[in-house]
């Protein structure tokens, strides 16, 4: 192996059996990671390290992406490439980068949108590149009640999405592609040269032309249908299934429900809000409710009415039920769908004593006949007295 040269497969992080697609995918990731424009202002040492990495990655890709060069490298290694004169001829890493990403590519987003995305129409040429005029993803919100959350529900949502203008095929020009002329701003190049000062002196970089979006062309006359916007708005109705047990703030995603442009389709993201209940509270997959009962019924036992997710139901409260005591009804909680869990949660009822009813004097005298010392109160008073003695 040539002195100082790393194995090209190791450089790209792929195996020797990697396909051309695997190699290109690895190159795109590493080239973006080490591109000098991404490390401006990080210090001379860091910039130098990334420049060397960038050159190394591009060199490895130039060899492994070429069937003939890769075959020679696999058989004879770096020495074989040296014999063929590859290492002596030199190369420009930016030429390789631009051949993959396009000549108009730039990390400079001045005046651009964070949603700008370049794709090709047919051949990968500068004239065919198109910048998406809008984000493809659509986000909407929908609120459901606590009861709907516990059992799951169906919601119909209405929203407006954008689709490619069929009159101009997304070019924004009258007559479509035939109505496009050379861009005045970039003179048909698709990019604008920009001089920037750096520690190495004045560096010239390419910036995507914002006037034509990197196409090198612009509309001679705007499309009469879309007024040059390249799209039309379409009112859309969609029915969505909201599973039981969904949490407040969770999102449901339809991979093909978003905006469309030039054959690309975005996602529809539905953010679900769960309205709070005045009765119930969620604790994981269980449902908790505080229930007021008459102290006399709690003492003597009897029928009370309990709130459940299916409605109000009668329940026989045993005699001597204490305030704060819990009644657990298995399976009475959230009924998760198969997408979450198969077992339903529990309904937990917490008993609280209501204010005692008002009784007449004769009734109170009669009730006093049944009063006997309360052992819990007696223990509390003894502890209180001991506290004062200490």
Swiss-Prot record:
One BP annotation, GO: response to heat
Subunit structure: Homodimer.
Per-repeat ranges for CXXCXGXG motif: 165-172, 183-190, 209-216, 223-230
UniProt domain J: residue ranges: 5-79
Alphabetical UniProt keywords: Chaperone, Cytoplasm, DNA replication, Metal-binding, Repeat, Stress response, Zinc, Zinc-finger
Highest taxon in the source lineage: Bacteria
Residues annotated as transmembrane: none
Required cofactor names: Zn(2+)
Residues where Zn(2+) 2 binds: 183, 186, 209, 212
SMART domains reported in the protein's UniProt record: DnaJ (SM00271)
Protein name in the entry: Chaperone protein DnaJ
Gene that this sequence comes from: dnaJ
Major place of residence: cytoplasm
Residues at which Zn(2+) 1 binds: 165, 168, 223, 226
Role description: Participates actively in the response to hyperosmotic and heat shock by preventing the aggregation of stress-denatured proteins and by disaggregating proteins, also in an autonomous, DnaK-independent fashion. Unfolded proteins bind initially to DnaJ; upon interaction with the DnaJ-bound protein, DnaK hydrolyzes its bound ATP, resulting in the formation of a stable complex. GrpE releases ADP from DnaK; ATP binding to DnaK triggers the release of the substrate protein, thus completing the reaction cycle.
Zn finger region (CR-type): 152-235
Molecular functions (GO terms): ATP binding; heat shock protein binding; unfolded protein binding; zinc ion binding
Domain notes: The J domain is necessary and sufficient to stimulate DnaK ATPase activity. Zinc center 1 plays an important role in the autonomous, DnaK-independent chaperone activity of DnaJ. Zinc center 2 is essential for interaction with DnaK and for DnaJ activity.
Cofactor note: Binds 2 Zn(2+) ions per monomer.
Stored Pfam families: DnaJ, DnaJ_C, DnaJ_CXXCXGXG
One of the record's GO cellular component terms: cytoplasm
Keyword Mitochondrion: no
Compartments where found: Cytoplasm
Gene3D superfamilies xref list: DnaJ domain, Heat shock protein DnaJ, cysteine-rich domain, Urease metallochaperone UreE, N-terminal domain
Family (UniProt): Belongs to the DnaJ family.
């Amino acid at each position: 192996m040539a002195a100082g040269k790393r194995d090209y497969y190791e450089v790209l992080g792929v195996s020797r059996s990697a396909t051309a697609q695997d190699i290109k995918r690895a190159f795109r990731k590493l080239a973006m990671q080490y591109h000098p424009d991404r490390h401006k202002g990080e210090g001379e040492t860091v910039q130098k390290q990334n420049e060397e990495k960038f050159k190394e990655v591009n060199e490895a890709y130039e060899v492994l992406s070429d069937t003939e060069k890769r075959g020679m490298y696999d058989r004879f290694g770096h020495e074989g490439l040296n014999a063929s004169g590859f290492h002596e001829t030199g190369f420009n890493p930016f030429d390789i980068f631009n051949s993959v990403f396009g000549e108009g590519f730039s990390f400079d987003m001045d005046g651009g949108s964070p949603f700008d995305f370049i794709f090709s129409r047919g051949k990968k040429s500068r004239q065919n590149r198109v910048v998406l005029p809008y984000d493809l993803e659509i986000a909407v919100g929908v609120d459901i009640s606590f009861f709907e959350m516990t059992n799951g529900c169906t919601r119909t949502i209405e929203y407006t999405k954008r689709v490619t203008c069929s009159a101009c095929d997304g070019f924004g020009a009258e007559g479509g592609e035939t109505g496009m002329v050379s861009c005045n701003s970039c003179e048909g190049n698709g990019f604008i040269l920009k001089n920037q000062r750096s520690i190495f002196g004045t560096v010239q970089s390419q910036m995507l032309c914002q006037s034509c979006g990197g196409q090198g062309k612009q509309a001679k006359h705007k499309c009469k249908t879309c007024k040059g916007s390249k799209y039309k708005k379409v009112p859309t109705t969609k029915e969505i299934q909201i599973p039981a047990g969904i949490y407040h703030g969770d999102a449901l995603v339809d991979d093909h429900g978003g905006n469309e442009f030039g054959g690309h389709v975005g996602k529809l993201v539905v953010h679900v809000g769960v309205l709070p209940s005045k009765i119930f509270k969620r604790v994981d997959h269980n449902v908790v409710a505080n229930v007021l009962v008459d102290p006399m019924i709690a003492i003597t036992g009897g029928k009370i009415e309990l709130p459940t997710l299916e409605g109000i139901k009668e329940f026989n409260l045993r005699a001597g039920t204490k305030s704060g005591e819990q009644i657990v009804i298995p399976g009475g909680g959230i009924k998760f769908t198969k997408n979450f869990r198969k077992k339903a949660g529990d309904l937990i009822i917490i008993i609280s004593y209501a204010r005692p009813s008002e009784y007449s004097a004769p009734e109170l005298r009669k009730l006093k006949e049944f009063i006997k010392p309360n052992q819990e109160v007696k223990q509390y008073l003894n502890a209180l007295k001991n506290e004062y003695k200490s």
